[in-house]
């Protein structure tokens, strides 16, 4: 028995049970809103304890990062292997206004790309956008068979791989530094940068499965409420965003 403990005083009345309080009665639900860059702006809901005294619920919500499948944001299963990170920057009533925080591939997609008899090329670069966001962009590519090739393997020489990697870094720096974060998001959805790398490296070595596999946000500028509201539209109540074009059109020949 513990020293100084009186069993008679600590014993409660028989038959009385402790009142069970549902913890959800002290919590509020908030709607997560994605930027208008994505077609579906309703990401989901999250909860937090209500504001009590000096503790404000909005302070606990700002900075939260949510990972969402791009297929849910775009309404297309073609993007199911990519994950988007959204960060809460502002609370408006029951709506959480988010901004782009990063991009990543699912592990099963990355494993499905790696095969034998081909060379893997990876490149990454740290670059600042036009609106002062510092990002680290990772690209991945694989060599493919050349036209009229008989040999089974498509391994590239180290010198060729260095040239391809240099070209990949050059294109990523150019494409990211000349646009804002919102414009970059519009490029990442239809994979404009990957197609540009594949097109530009044809003269060095033909590539396939060229993707921007990861984007990490390293540093962000001072928070600007005006730019965030512009990113979400004036009222920020629309459920649909604008559709991002793929950037190319099929050409139909009149005569063959």
Curated annotation (Swiss-Prot):
Modified residues (N-acetylalanine): 2
Main location: cytoplasm
A molecular function GO annotation: structural constituent of ribosome
GO cellular component: cytosolic small ribosomal subunit
Entry keywords, A to Z: Acetylation, Cytoplasm, Ribonucleoprotein, Ribosomal protein
GO biological process: translation
SMART domains: Ribosomal_S3Ae (SM01397)
Subcellular location: Cytoplasm
Cysteine disulfide links: none
InterPro entries registered for this protein in UniProt: Ribosomal_eS1, Ribosomal_eS1_CS, Ribosomal_eS1_euk
PROSITE patterns: RIBOSOMAL_S3AE
Pfam families: Ribosomal_S3Ae
Family listed: Belongs to the eukaryotic ribosomal protein eS1 family.
Subunit (UniProt): Component of the small ribosomal subunit. Mature ribosomes consist of a small (40S) and a large (60S) subunit. The 40S subunit contains about 33 different proteins and 1 molecule of RNA (18S). The 60S subunit contains about 49 different proteins and 3 molecules of RNA (25S, 5.8S and 5S).
HAMAP family per the UniProt record, alphabetical: Ribosomal_eS1_euk
Entry protein name: Small ribosomal subunit protein eS1
Source species of the chain: Candida tropicalis (strain ATCC MYA-3404 / T1)
Phylogenetic classification of the source organism: Eukaryota, Fungi, Dikarya, Ascomycota, Saccharomycotina
Gene: RPS1
